[in-house]
Amino acid sequence: MADTLRYPFAAVPGPGAVVSVAPGVLWVRMPLPMVLDHINLWLLEDGDGWTIVDTGLKSSRIQGHWEQVFAAHLGGKPVKRVIATHMHPDHIGQAGWLCGHWNCELWITRTDWLFARMLSLEALPEPPRDAVEFYRRVGFPVDALDFFRNSGYGNFAKGVTPIPIGHQDRKSTRLNSSHT
């Protein structure tokens, strides 16, 4: 057994660039401002257009990277849909902007869509008392509780563009006769 990881590609895509991993499948990599410093996203050729899988965090910098990708790699074809695999901000953060930019639908499970919509609308100066009490009961140390109390509540909204009001529920959809 090898003691190092082997990667199938010698290079990773830089900001605004892609790597073709299979016919009609482009790997896009967007930066994240944390220890895990990137997210892998995908462009799938979809007949007369493209499907985006996951979107990156809300930021004008990432929107600029997407604009570079659109200009250089879509071959003049539109984006037909955006699929968010789940509701974390790095996966759905640019969904509102992308769907508005391309006038296309967001595809996501109903539960993740509802949760993302709820979290994006709930920004408060401090967390609700029951949220603080929950973390106290599960054993958060006092300093962590103080940090939680004083950090504001609703940071999810800072990492996402407005979540589209409409969506296509992924559980019942198919792409190219295959389940999503």
Where are these regions (language model features)?
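N-terminal presequences and immediately downstream first alpha-helices
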Residues: 1-10
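Glycine-rich, flexible loop/turn motifs
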Residues: 5, 14-17, 159-161
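A generic secondary-structure micro-motif detector
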Residues: 6, 56, 84-85
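Residues that act as N-cap/strand-start positions at coil-to-secondary-structure junctions
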Residues: 12-13, 36-38, 163, 170-172
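Conserved beta-strand hairpin/beta-sheet module of binuclear metal-dependent hydrolase folds
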Residues: 15-77, 104
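Active-site HxH/HxHxD metal-binding segment of metal-dependent hydrolases
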Residues: 61, 67-172
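Single conserved hydrophobic/aromatic residue that forms the stacking wall/gate
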Residues: 171, 175-180
